[in-house]
Amino acid sequence: MKKKIIIISSLGAFLIILGVVISILVPPEIDNTGYTLIENLKVPVYSKVKVKDLITSIEGKVITNKTLNTEKLGKQEVSFVYKNKNDKEKRGVFTIDVVDEEKPLVWLSGSYSARVGSNLNLEDEIFCTDNYDSNPTCKIEGTYDLNKAGTYNLTYVATDSNKNEERINFTLNVYEPAPATTTQTPAPAEEREEVVTAFNDVVATHKDENTEIGIDVSKWQGDIDFKKVKDAGATFVMVRVGSQQGVDGEYVLDPYFKQNIENALANDLKVGVYFYSYANSKKEARKQADWVLDQIKDYELTLPIAFDWECYNSFNQMELSLFGLNEVAESFLEKVEDKEYDGMLYGSKNYLNSIWKYHDYDVWLAHYTDQTDYDSHYVMWQLCQDGRIDGINTAVDINVLYKNDTK
């Protein structure tokens, strides 16, 4: 009798397990009648879209609200599971079209000036890139002669591989140099009062229960008395660990890094570091992260490692899309987070809005103003570069850190 009970119990358990396996391996039947999709199923490339974003109504609820892969252009079948009004699992299937309809990004001045005989290269002066295409066609329409004085009306045209086009008109003024005149003793320059931002004023304006006030430093600040810095009210410091000497250049340790980080830690300041990068590939960025990790291995950081990339003058020659540049930054930050450090991306407001659009990392915002209107997520705000604080004899950047990790 016991043997029969054991056999029956084992069989029951087997059937339950078999049912679970079948439910996993055999998807629910397709039923596209229980929901309604939006009319236009064109999805912008690199956009963060979930299944629910494309459904206007459903008789039940979505079970698998997955994020769609939008990194590849073209038609893509989407399959998801939902429960219908009868609480039965069904499968919805539809097709989206991932498209690139974004114009290339062009930054230029409304007018340029050059002396007759100048070797000005306008193509190098103008920033031209694209969200998807790593090598958009960028050209100047119209004729001009750098050896002939005059005003030339020109048009800068940028076209990507998906035929998106940006056209911007601008003016080139080619001028003759002014004739030499008799040398005269120049009038004495007016003395102007130096405009500075006092650390105490920043504390008075921005310190509250959710914020801390600190600084970021490098070799440009020289020798620092961190005891005075702390006594002045600073609670943290971001220390430059080093920089890259141009595109494909060597990595150089900031000559003040060791004394800065050691003295900051000795005075019980919270410490993070940043690296000034010219990386033009994911491989290069990971290599830089390894280098930074090696420099900081003997120190205890309580704040993030920041990736500081600002070489926009060299960007035209890098053959990177905007998405590709974001991948470069992510490669650096992924590497440091793999070693259980926090990663952070440094950028100014305009660059964060226009260029650093395809990442999910914390942001160190640079925006020199009393009250920033940057409306995306950031954890630290560099609000000035002309700060003054006891313990430092030169100007210094002042920062606000948000304790709840968000602003």
What are these regions (language model features)?
Residues 207-232, 238-331, 337-339:
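Substrate-binding cleft of extracellular glycoside hydrolase catalytic domains
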Residues 15-25:
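Hydrophobic alpha-helical membrane-insertion segments, chiefly the h-region
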Residues 1-14:
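N-terminal Sec-pathway targeting helices
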Residues 26-59, 102-133:
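Solvent-exposed, low-complexity, repeat-rich "mucin-like" stalks and linkers
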Residues 182-217, 358-407:
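Functionally critical loop-and-helix segments that line ligand-binding/catalytic clefts
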Residues 97-105, 173-181:
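Extracellular interdomain linker/stem segments of modular secreted and single-pass surface proteins
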Residues 57-94, 133-174:
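Serine/threonine-rich, repeat-prone extracellular segments and beta-strand-based repeat modules
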Residues 340-353:
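Aromatic-lined carbohydrate-recognition surfaces of secreted/lumenal glycan-active proteins
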